[in-house]
Amino acid sequence: MKELVVDLKEKSYSIIIKKGLINELSNEINKVYKGKKIFILTDENVNYHYGDKVKDSLINNGYDVKKIVLKPGEETKSFNTLPKIYNEFLDFKLTRSDLIITLGGGVIGDLGGFAASTFLRGIDFIQVPTSLLAQVDSSVGGKVAVDLDRGKNLVGSFYHPKVVLIDPDVLITLEEKFFKDGMAEVIKYGCIKDKEFFYKLKEFKSKDEVLDNIEDIIYTCCNIKRIVVENDEKDKGERMLLNFGHTLGHAIEAYYNFNKYTHGEAVGIGMYKIIKISEEKGIMPKGCADEIKDILIQYSLPYDIEIENSDEILETISLDKKNINSVLKIVLLESIGQSFLKSTNIEFFK
């Protein structure tokens, strides 16, 4: 078992990483919640493997439990899904002294967390991330949000969980493409903050080797994010470094209506493209783009695409929340493991 504490004064919380944790959630929940009513949000895929198991375990430990099962995929993380969730909360007579559990990947964590933050002005929630992407990234840091038709995460808030409970064993049932999806975010951490970690990832020869080291991998990623979030909770400076690859990545996702590329695939493309553009413009010395390309290929992730309608991509980038007064902050690398923010504008991408 590994444990980290995100130190945010009265909003501090633990991240617990332990194989088999899905079978003993009640023990950890009891440490942070003394009530009896729990509402679980999950999706159809996760529910198939773990939904009833978690619900029955909680009921057997004396909790009054209701579960909502949503369709998997980014389309569910829509503003339009919220009324359905709020109505389920009302039917269950959920109060501010009760608890919500998000059992799923990044979509469920973001959507459920945002619903928790807004219903009755805030109900405590616990993250139980079941995808690699959620375990290493989206479940930590308190960013919760939903998408609008014109882009990702345009309606959201900062709302931290009471605890994050990570069981690496659940990754065994994760679809292969979503395991690769999560590896893109893992690679991102090496790119922006940890050169040694990046090159360690390059040494792994198989998925089995990655899984043999998965607790350490998750811990390293969560620890990097913990440090950044403690220094810049509200995303005004250093935390923006975590968005490496995301400016273009989010635009690619929206351009293809969130159904051609997974989030991680789009971020991988975004990481490579932004460094390649920077090298071509002479902002960075050549070399980093090829290293990123090589590791993306190693993990069977795409690194480049042809955009047929670049105007649509540029329009989406202009809506990016890092675009303030027409000044767009992008994340670049001095070298692998050394990242920095550069102020530019939309012309950078033309």
From Swiss-Prot:
Pfam families according to UniProt: DHQ_synthase (PF01761), DHQS_C (PF24621)
Cofactor note: Binds 1 divalent metal cation per subunit. Can use either Co(2+) or Zn(2+).
Cofactor(s) of this protein: Co(2+); Zn(2+); NAD(+)
GO molecular function annotations of the record: 3-dehydroquinate synthase activity; metal ion binding; nucleotide binding
Subcellular location: Cytoplasm
Record-level GO cellular component terms: cytoplasm
Binding site for NAD(+): 106-110, 130-131, 143, 152
Main location, first listed in the record: cytoplasm
Residues annotated as signal peptide: none
Pathway recorded for this protein: Metabolic intermediate biosynthesis; chorismate biosynthesis; chorismate from D-erythrose 4-phosphate and phosphoenolpyruvate: step 2/7
Reactions catalysed according to its record: 7-phospho-2-dehydro-3-deoxy-D-arabino-heptonate = 3-dehydroquinate + phosphate
Keywords: Amino-acid biosynthesis, Aromatic amino acid biosynthesis, Cobalt, Cytoplasm, Lyase, Metal-binding, NAD, Nucleotide-binding, Zinc
GO biological process per UniProt: amino acid biosynthetic process; aromatic amino acid family biosynthetic process; chorismate biosynthetic process
EC number from the UniProt entry: 4.2.3.4
Family of this protein: Belongs to the sugar phosphate cyclases superfamily. Dehydroquinate synthase family.
Role this protein plays: Catalyzes the conversion of 3-deoxy-D-arabino-heptulosonate 7-phosphate (DAHP) to dehydroquinate (DHQ).
UniProt-recorded name of the protein: 3-dehydroquinate synthase
Organism name: Clostridium botulinum (strain Alaska E43 / Type E3)
